[in-house]
Amino acid sequence: MTYTPRRVSKVFLCSVPILAIGFAAPRALRVAGVYHTIGGVLFVAIVAAAWILGARSIRSGRESEQRLALAGALLLTPFTLVALFWVGLGPPWETTPPENVMRYLVLLVSSIAVTGGFVLLKDALSDAGERNYSTLALAATILAGAAYLIWMSFMLGYYVVAVRDGKAPAAMNSLAEVFDILLDVACLLTYLATATFAASLGRVRWLGRGATRVYVAVNLIASFCLLMSSMSSPDPAAHSTPWYARPGFVAGIPAIPFIMPFLLGVVLLRRAGEKPSTNGVLY
């Protein structure tokens, strides 16, 4: 592969979370044939770009390169699925129960993929000699993955029941409000895990100093906004300010904490696709 295709692939992949969210937000795109086409094109483009950048090392690279490539691919999974399935989906309160079944199934698979990607990243960092920050990050990752798994499974079951019976039982509505705190915990731990992994990547020079600071700062700011929002009503209809203009509410949307892991996945794929003689900072 030449340098130019890999560079273009990296730039495109870095823009994928914004593209995926941009296409998912407008409900007007949820037209049969339209959202299928857009989602299919985005999915193929993401897979092709990831392959060019370094995902091909999963098949043909050395063991260390395979580990990095697989970790990167897993971290790219959430917004790859969002781009494929969520075009025109809109927020949960605007969609039908069958659409929300698909929404939470995607989120469930995404949370499992991110947890798996971070576990592989921890092994790669340990092999590179960084064990302190990566171990702390792994602990946060496992706790976040467990919290996500419980919350996503409950919400998936909630909408499966709603589809089957026409509406969810009142008892499940009450539980859904209680379970919201579990989502906040999952999001918070994901932000903290991502920040700590970024610091670990910086220590082994897989991230530049400036990039490391940006990753850490963004995740800590998101954590702070989420904590402040958790102290107020989580109901988007209870505020005069639109939900998308409230940083704390946005930080607590289940898919948002997966943005920075996605970008770390791009970094890992780039490193996996580099020639063996390349040992410098990659991002």
What is the meaning of each model-derived region?
Residues 1-283:
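Hydrophobic, aromatic-enriched alpha-helical segments typical of multi-pass transmembrane helices
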